[in-house]
UniProtKB/Swiss-Prot annotation:
Binding-site residues for Zn(2+), renumbered to this chain: 27, 208, 233, 237
Name used for this protein in its record: Cysteine--tRNA ligase
Taxonomic source organism: Lawsonia intracellularis (strain PHE/MN1-00)
GO biological process terms, semicolon-separated: cysteinyl-tRNA aminoacylation
Manner of cofactor binding, per the entry note: Binds 1 zinc ion per subunit.
Amino acid sequence: MHLYNTMEKKKEPLIPIISGKLGIYVCGITAYDFSHIGHARSAIVFDILVRLLRYQGYDVTFIRNFTDIDDKIINRANKEGRSSKEVAEEFINAFHEDMDRLGVLNADIEPKATDYIPEMIECCQKLLEADKAYITASGDVYFRVRSFPDYGKLSGRTPDELRIGVRIVPSEEKEDPLDFVLWKAAKPGEPSWESPWGRGRPGWHIECSAMSEKCWPLPLDIHGGGIDLIFPHHENEIAQTESIVNKPLAKIWMHNGLVQVNSEKMSKSLGNFKIVRDILEAYLPETLRFFLLKKHYRSPIDFSFEGMNETERSQKRVYECIAEVDKALERKSWDSGGSSSSILAELDEQFSLFMSALEDDCNTAAGLGHLFNIIHIVRRALDDKALYSTTDGKVVFEQFREIIRKVDILLGVFGQKPNSFLQDLKTIRIIRNKIDVNQVEELLSKRRQAREEKNFVQADEVRNTLASLGIEIRDTSEGQVWDIL
């Protein structure tokens, strides 16, 4: 297993610090609003990582925190006349609901910032005692960035380079513009806690330092998050933590790429902010999950409804293949003969390549390419009349079903009952495309009657009318079957 380490700017073999065990910490959401697709991507990326590592036999402890005290949470609480705790709890619960729908496994430990205030105060005290931090006249506590010689090692830039073109919160009380807040002095209308230097609340960065140190013996094997967290959040985490413990915060740093919308940065100001639960009103959860797996996790991914529609078509092809295999396996008796050895070898080779792709920095994009090769191979077997009903054919289909079972374990896709999924897919596409089912059924009835009367011209006219409505027709032994183009 090799992973790209942001710190070293290269892929490295994953070697656990504690034999057989892995500690993974990923920065979670700030709980002030519903989760967007950027949150979903990060959650799914690290869900795949954890699934893969457990499949390989590692004892994984997966930690994902919640920031439940922050300016944005406080602002929303004040605006809505609620407490910060109520706001945070609402959106933590909403996050869990959304991730459950997307098939994201629960983290083993989910620390909330407000449960670790004493640990954060202790971190601040240690930094003050080491002269790595200072208290201002107003009661804020700041970290001295230049007291940490390695500051900038994650982003690969020096402190002076980081000052250029970076939005820095100004303060006349700072010794250096790059210094960042560890503790914010209490303000009216804000939650606050007692500390040796007065009431206040923690800064964002110290939260993760305290929680990660408390939840796993440092260094972590892997620390992860979105690429937008490299600076300042992860850079500041490193400076704080390593100034306290005098050893690395993490061995490997992993960062997923951002989500764009129609090739533009996703932001509320551009009006292209995509909330997970809004998308799931129009698409099945597995479609969004599958869409987010189609690009390598370190690359940006461009969200579009056209891309989601193409993902649906790909899903449909896979589930239709699974349904046909399941139907073939319903046979009560099988003929002897057939020749499956070459097909089985092809399936084994493609699944081995699928696994190699995942083990090469979680390359789901390449892995899915091999999965579609497997679908193509099985399609050939389904069309091979000399093989279809034989015992060798049964072996091929059972092998395929075992591969799909493993794909579901590893990627969390294609594990549903195929006919149920295909019906759900048809239903949500009917709703999304505002298809009048009664109109479709009336036209199908007219076409059926025209075919019975051998009026094929009229039958073709009805087919064309249905096509103009976005409906395709297939004539089967069981009658007309319609679906959405």
